[in-house]
A protein has these predicted regions:
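Hydrophobic alpha-helical segments of secondary membrane carriers
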Residues: 18, 147-151, 205, 285, ...
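Hydrophobic transmembrane-helix bundles of small-molecule transporters
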Residues: 169-284, 292
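Transmembrane core module of solute transporters
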Residues: 12-59, 241, 253, 263-399, ...
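Interfacial helix-cap and linker-helix signal at transmembrane-aqueous boundaries
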Residues: 36-37, 72-73, 162-170, 224, ...
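Transmembrane-helix exit segments and adjacent C-terminal regions of multi-pass membrane proteins
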Residues: 1-15, 23, 278, 346-349, ...
């Protein structure tokens, strides 16, 4: 089928709308959480489980559905599923805006509606790369996927800014902002998108594969999530029998998953595609990259909101907005390099461009790990910009490498597999990084609190303030407020009157708690950055092993001694 120049950009515009809508929605919630919790009258210090589910539930549901939706799209049409994704996402955004309840009921409604929204997001994500790949020739796919990367990162930044602005007026507006995107995308895709894909043979749904993957991923991530929440007298939940059972059953299910997929007639996770060298190494490199970088943004926002911004005179209420502003160098690096790396990979192949990107990311992690908590912004911005440049160099060439390596009828399932690996790794990375930080805080925070109180002559408050759990301290930083103020305001009047006025002002000011938290937080944060550097370095090695430039379907005529001329797929060296 001949694809017009006009249609390529029509398809691209549809995908860009979905990318902007999805990523704006993800980051806008991240920044607006304090306003959301205040709006539904939830005390975040006592509601960690709601915070974690609002943050991680979206990624969990998306990750578990991508594979099935990718396979269904190959069988029934990518455009049809893409349109349905727009419709569901828009409907869920309206429900979130209209959330009627407050308190625990309101939090549960938001979580449920976010799950519905994630279903729409999974339908969009499973098909976006495949629709671009169908519409663009192999010589332009890297550029096209690079442009989509720019839209994704622009959406992340716009979400941070919009969340900071809209939450000031009404927390519901942070969900309403997705509705115009959804309506435009639904109408535009219905009237303009065409079904260009070669449909795969319709087969039965892989029920056992879906079941083992869904159970495995869900229980494993649920176990990790509740492992972060205090249980009984323990500051973390790893001794909770339900957490232990979830982790064990989840791991067993995931071990069973490839065994099941190797035996069913129509697997949703096509293990045979991993026989292709380019597909296999690109996906594994992507997995390690996502594991290394997935939790990094949350850790950096914790660092900015809980420590650096208050130390530099920003009020706690303003830190969510300014944290988004100070993350701009990361976004700028990706926006600059995304299209450039895509164009270069179209011409020279993805191997060395993507590998160079992971090497730069490794260096950026090491720079971040070397910074003191009271760093200068120039140092921080340089590290973030390097991280963005490296991420931009890796992202679009790696995606193009994966999508170019499969036949047209398998692009939906390949896209679903790619984004499943990416989303699962991002969600797991966030849980892993949180765990590393909380374990470190558990060991160091009570000691740091006692020492800081003694330094200001308030050792008598140690029994009270040392009871702040590490989890409470961490999420207080994440939500941008000082938990010491809440605790002191709840003290009985006679006890509060015994605290000297100058000491009270020091405790509730913008510098004492961040400095105390920093002494316990920074060593664990540095450990997370070193782990990110190691994972990125391994990803660079695997990226280099992917082989030369390869595009499935590009053929040359070779002379066969028995059959004369016949077409063959080849791998060209860079």
């Amino acid at each position: 089928m001949v694809i017009s120049l006009e249609y390529k950009w029509i398809a691209m515009s549809n995908v860009l709308i979905s990318s902007l809508m999805g990523t704006i929605n993800m980051s806008i919630v991240l920044i607006a959480l304090p306003a959301i919790f205040n709006g539904i009258h939830i005390n975040p210090l006592n509601s960690f489980q709601y915070l974690l589910w609002i943050l991680m539930g979206y990624g969990l549901v998306t990750a578990t559905l991508l594979l099935s939706f990718g396979r269904l799209s190959d069988m029934y049409g990518r455009v049809k599923m893409f349109r349905l994704g727009f419709l569901i996402f828009t409907f869920a955004s309206i429900l979130l805006y209209l959330t009627p309840s407050t308190g625990d009921a309101g939090a549960l409604e938001i979580i449920i509606f976010r799950v519905v929204q994630a279903v729409g997001s999974a339908l969009l994500m499973a098909n976006s790369a495949a629709i671009i790949t169908d519409a663009f020739p192999s010589t332009e796919r890297g550029k096209a996927l690079g442009i989509n990367t720019v839209a994704i990162m622009s959406g992340m930044f716009l979400g941070l800014i919009l969340g900071g602005i809209l939450a000031v007026f009404n927390w519901r507006y942070v969900f309403l902002v997705s509705v115009p995107f959804g309506l435009i995308g639904t109408i535009w895709s219905y009237y303009k998108l065409k079904e260009l894909s070669v449909k795969a043979v319709k087969t039965g749904l892989d029920i056992w594969g879906n079941l083992t993957f869904l159970v495995g991923i869900t229980l494993l991530l649920v176990g990790v999530t509740y492992g972060l929440i205090p249980y009984g007298s323990s500051p973390m939940g790893w001794s909770n029998p339900w957490v232990i059972a979830s982790m064990i059953i989840g791991l067993i299910s995931l071990i069973m998953f490839p065994i099941v997929e190797s035996r069913v007639e129509s697997p949703m996770f096509r293990l045979d595609l991993f026989k292709n060298r380019s597909f296999a190494y690109a996906n594994i490199a992507g997995l390690l990259s996502a594991l290394g970088r997935g939790g990094m943004m949350f850790m950096l926002i914790l660092l900015l909101q809980g420590i650096w911004l208050p130390l530099h005179g920003y009020s706690y209420s303003s830190t969510p907005f300014w944290a988004g502003i100070y993350m701009l160098p990361l976004t700028a690096g990706i926006i600059i390099m995304g299209p450039i790396s895509g164009i270069l990979s179209d011409k020279y192949g993805p191997r060395w461009i993507a590998t160079g990107g992971m090497i730069i990311v490794t260096i950026a992690f090491l720079v971040l790990a070397s910074l003191p908590y009271n760093f200068t912004f120039i140092e921080f911005a340089l590290a973030l910009f390097l991280m963005g440049i490296g991420g931009g160099m890796f992202g679009s060439p790696n995606s193009a490498s994966i999508m170019n390596s499969v036949p047209p009828e398998d692009r939906g399932v390949a896209s679903g597999m790619m984004y499943t690996i990416m989303n699962t790794s991002f969600t797991a990375s966030m849980a892993i990084f949180f765990t590393i930080v909380i374990v470190g805080l558990t060991q160091r925070f009570p000691v740091a609190m006692t020492a800081s109180l003694a330094n200001i002559g308030a050792a008598q408050l140690s029994p009270i303030l040392s009871n702040i759990s590490p989890t409470a301290a961490l999420f207080s930083a994440f939500l941008g407020f000082n938990p010491v103020s809440s605790i002191l305001s709840a003290l009985p009047a006679p006890l509060a009157a015994m605290i000297p006025h100058s000491t009270f002002n020091t405790l509730t000011g913008t510098t004492w708690f961040p400095s105390t938290l920093a002494n316990a937080f920074i060593p664990s944060l540095q450990t997370s950055f070193y782990i990110g550097a190691i994972l990125s370095a391994i990803a660079a090695v695997l990226s280099a092993l992917r082989g030369g430039k390869y595009v499935h379907g590009d053929e040359i005529l070779k002379t066969d001694s028995n059959n004369g001329l016949k077409p063959q797929e080849v791998e060209t060296e860079e």
